Amino acid sequence: MSIRIKIDKLRQIVAYFSEFSEEVSINVDSTDELMYIFAALGGSVNIWAIIPLSASVFYRGAENIVFNLPVSKVKSCLCSFHNDAIIDIEPDLENNLVKLSSYHVVSVDCNKELMPIRTDTTICLSIDQKKSYVFNFHKYEEKCCGRTVIHLEWLLGFIKCISQHQHLAIMFKDDNIIMKTPGNTDAFSREYSMTECSQELQKFSFKIAISSLNKLRGFKKRVNVFETRIVMDNDDNILGMLFSDRVQSFKINIFMAFLD
């Protein structure tokens, strides 16, 4: 079982995720024809991308597979492949490896006769495959009780001014979401109108770590605005905030849990 992927698509993925983590977990769902890429950033922050299987990302297998990919190592070695390469990614779960391979054929004029010259490249990278696991992505898309749009640069500017605090209070009033620093002295408050806000949600208040919001800084060059949802599970437990956007050719999600 392996994934065949165009090098341009692989470059996008590793360039993006290597800014946040040295490795990611890849989950291929052959039934839904989707590939999920997941990384845990710490502090109850999870990031994942959803990529449809297609001509540029093709899965050679019938069963679902989960494995780890060392994106930082992959990013460093992609210069070994031709710019038009299609790369096979094959995990070796038993030996804690992942293999990248590709070939390229060019025609060379040899005594006025075109001769095909084939170049094969194979790179084996070590990575602990025992830690890979299936992440329940659907849990965070089951229910939404609030929705707004947040301009990333403005949010980052706001939290830069309140770096002396550890968390923000999250409240809901008159179909608005309010982010506020603790206390009434030297207090900062940011308010967003919401396109969707359940009446039940406006009875609650939460806390979110500023260190979690700071992890959005890595998106600054790629994202202008995030669709932001307050998500719940099937038992109506409010889980946290889900930031979503489409980056280049794939959808990206960042989930931040509310603090207890």
Swiss-Prot record:
Stored InterPro entries: Pox_TAP
Protein's GO biological process: DNA-templated viral transcription; regulation of DNA-templated transcription
Induction: Expressed in the intermediate phase of the viral replicative cycle.
UniProtKB keywords: Activator, Transcription, Transcription regulation
Any GO molecular function: identical protein binding
Family to which this protein belongs: Belongs to the chordopoxvirinae VLTF-1 family.
Its job: Associates with RNA polymerase to initiate transcription from late gene promoters.
Assembly mode: Interacts with the late transcription factors VLTF-2 and VLTF-3. Interacts with the late transcription elongation factor H5/VLTF-4. Interacts with itself.
Protein name, per record: Late transcription factor 1
Organism: Vaccinia virus (strain Western Reserve) (VACV)
